[in-house]
Amino acid sequence: MATINDNYLKLKAGYLFPEIARRVKTFAEANPDAKIIKLGIGDVTEPLPEACRTAMIKAIEDMGDRGTFKGYGPEQGYEWLREKIATHDFQARNCDVDASEIFVSDGAKCDTGNILDIFGKNNKIAVTDPVYPVYVDTNVMAGHTGEVNDKGEYEGLVYLPINAENNFIAEIPSQKVDIIYLCFPNNPTGATATKDYLKNWVDYAKANGSIIFFDAAYEAFITDSSLPHSIYEIEGARDCAIEFRSFSKNAGFTGTRCALTVVPKTLTAKASDGSDVELWKLWNRRQSTKFNGVSYIVQRGAEAVYSEAGKAQVQALISFYLENAQIICDKLKGAGFEVYGGVNAPYIWLKTPHNLSSWDFFDKLLQTANVVGTPGSGFGAAGEGYFRISAFNSRENVLEAMKRITSQFHL
């Protein structure tokens, strides 16, 4: 008889965002005239940059001609895109990253989960709390944890609390961990990391033989020139870190799907016999076996991000969403909310008013203002009493949402 992966049974009921969608659907069906504004899931609203659209249209025409038609592409991504990424995103910041170390994929979310395929089951995993739920859930699915406890924490994971007291920056653990998830600018809190802070993590990882999974999906929103965009801006990071990036939020590719993972060829981990194994070789083998590459059309669109027109259009998108974030911060602070993030990041992290739980505030906001956000507790036990609002929406909707919220809550 066929059996299942029992680890899936450990998962808490419902992934965060489907649960939000379920509650919103129930409310909308009961209140068909309500004009709901969604500032919850981090999905973009503005159109793809013209440079990307033009390149993709040209690529479609390429597919209509036998001479330029493309079938299966390289699983790692086309060389012309990987070279552009290496030059503009890394080498321009003095990061020692070669095009051959870049793997183009269909999403950073996929890669942060799939990367576990090349790691053993006995690694001690550290995550911040609150944290992007995918990091935790994929480790549960892979059998790297025990059962969930009454606090909503999984046995076997090391949770590093981030809160207002430590400026939402996790402290280096006193114990040894093998894999560390870091996300900066941070989802969900909007916190950022300095070079000195990341250097502490790199030093820790090198001293303990640990690997850092660095999620830089929101690096394009950094406007402070002193802040690092990549873990590879830190000396020694090539020997202890894998970086994940995405075109989703900077170029609006959430529905188009294109991302990348950097695995340095100098990066190694231990085999069961104690020998050092190059992780690049394992990830290359994994991708060649389980992934057929991102479509030619999409990769041409991603390549256009690095054209002069593409750069300007992407920057305009980023500035638009950051202006939304500024509006949200200003309006909520003016109404008396305790607000964090929203600077160098597209997410605003706020303390729920009147000691409401995260989900109670979600329901109250939906019912009274018809606005959707994300309960902080959905990102972990330490997120209880907090709430995330996304800057990814139209200006009209952001202004209307702030008008509704501040009319219902003035603290």
Curated annotation (Swiss-Prot):
EC number(s) given by UniProt: 2.6.1.83
Annotated metabolic or biological route of this protein: Amino-acid biosynthesis; L-lysine biosynthesis via DAP pathway; LL-2,6-diaminopimelate from (S)-tetrahydrodipicolinate (aminotransferase route): step 1/1
GO annotation terms (biological process): lysine biosynthetic process via diaminopimelate, diaminopimelate-aminotransferase pathway
Residues bearing PTM N6-(pyridoxal phosphate)lysine: 249
Cofactor(s), by name: pyridoxal 5'-phosphate
Superkingdom of the organism of origin: Bacteria
Broad enzyme group: transferase
Catalytic activity: (2S,6S)-2,6-diaminopimelate + 2-oxoglutarate = (S)-2,3,4,5-tetrahydrodipicolinate + L-glutamate + H2O + H(+)
Subunit and partners: Homodimer.
Family that this chain belongs to: Belongs to the class-I pyridoxal-phosphate-dependent aminotransferase family. LL-diaminopimelate aminotransferase subfamily.
Alphabetical list of NCBIfam families matching this protein: DAPAT_plant
Descriptive protein name: LL-diaminopimelate aminotransferase
Organism of provenance: Rippkaea orientalis (strain PCC 8801 / RF-1)
